Amino acid sequence: MENIAVLGAGSWGTALALVLADNGHHVRLWGHRTEQISEINEKRTNEKYLPGVRLPDAIIGYDDLCAALDGVAIVVLAVPTKAIRSVLADVRACLAKPITIVAVSKGIEPGTHKRVSEMVAEEMGEWLADVVVLSGPSHAEEVVLRHPTTVAVSSPNMEAARRIQDIFMNHHYFRVYTNPDLIGVEVGGALKNIIALAAGISDGLGYGDNAKAALITRGLAEIARLGCALGANPLTFAGLTGVGDLIVTCTSVHSRNWRAGYMLGQGKKLDEVLESMGMVVEGVRTTKAAYELAKELGVKMPITEALYDVLFAGKDPKEAVDSLMARGKKEEMDDLNNIFAEQE
């Protein structure tokens, strides 16, 4: 039994807090809004993010960060990627000894092109014992209903990953695998949000399953190209944190990236979409970062480029789809052949 702090009282942080509580751990769920924390402690609910869900008594809400961190050795980092550096700066000021951080946010930082684990390592320095990444096809709305869910964990220190695997594993509904390919696990989890935005746009435009299947398949090729250019194992993209996460995010109404894309496809502007969502849409920032990184590395990512033009250059979504369809002829398996040839 562990005392574990979960930083970020949104849907995913709350869902993981529930898993940990079900596993017998004492969970301190931190959020910066006092009224939300009061609701968690007094009503055992978090209605804005997970309506209708009762939270276990083992979850205690905190709005005081240092109090939430007092004496804990394991911290689950579930804040949006844009808030990671500022939150970790505050975390450092509270610590008396190094901690293990379980990073569960998915994204790549624009400008620096850092993955989440790299951001954590940079910000924490000597205060970091280990960083473990948890990723996979896992909508919070289904986890809190205790529906079967499977994820993977990865770390530069696989002994730490196995310890986190044990802490999160629930034999009734939450299965955890290990995967030593940290780069692949993070890239797959981050870039699937880009393709989910594109899939939502396709659905919003009224295109059917054929178009979405093509976006998912060719999107996976883009993810693998960029991931392997960064040093990932191509087989990771055939697993939970690759095609698994891609499928669930591109096909479910629970996906905020898909929902945002759907509204864009129906003609709404990006600012209007983000305001109406009321929650972070990680794929927007990740599209910018992946676009920049692909240019830097010379990796072809036509879907990402088309989405970038829609999000940041005002291109009409239908015109973006038309431009993808009008691309020159090519051999479908060139991507895979080149990737595996580079591994030899």
From Swiss-Prot:
Chief place of localization: cytoplasm
Pathway(s) of this molecule: Membrane lipid metabolism; glycerophospholipid metabolism
Matches recorded under PROSITE patterns: NAD_G3PDH
Signal peptide residues on this chain, from the entry's feature table: none
Subcellular compartments: Cytoplasm
UniProt entry keywords in alphabetical sequence: Cytoplasm, Lipid biosynthesis, Lipid metabolism, NAD, NADP, Nucleotide-binding, Oxidoreductase, Phospholipid biosynthesis, Phospholipid metabolism
GO cellular component: cytosol
Catalytic activity as recorded in UniProt: sn-glycerol 3-phosphate + NAD(+) = dihydroxyacetone phosphate + NADH + H(+); sn-glycerol 3-phosphate + NADP(+) = dihydroxyacetone phosphate + NADPH + H(+)
Positions that bind sn-glycerol 3-phosphate: K106, G136, S138, K192, D245, S255, R256, N257
Annotated EC: 1.1.1.94
Chain coiled-coil ranges: none
Role summary: Catalyzes the reduction of the glycolytic intermediate dihydroxyacetone phosphate (DHAP) to sn-glycerol 3-phosphate (G3P), the key precursor for phospholipid synthesis.
UniProt name for this protein: Glycerol-3-phosphate dehydrogenase [NAD(P)+]
Organism for this UniProt entry: Geobacillus kaustophilus (strain HTA426)
Lineage: Bacteria, Bacillati, Bacillota, Bacilli, Bacillales
Gene: gpsA
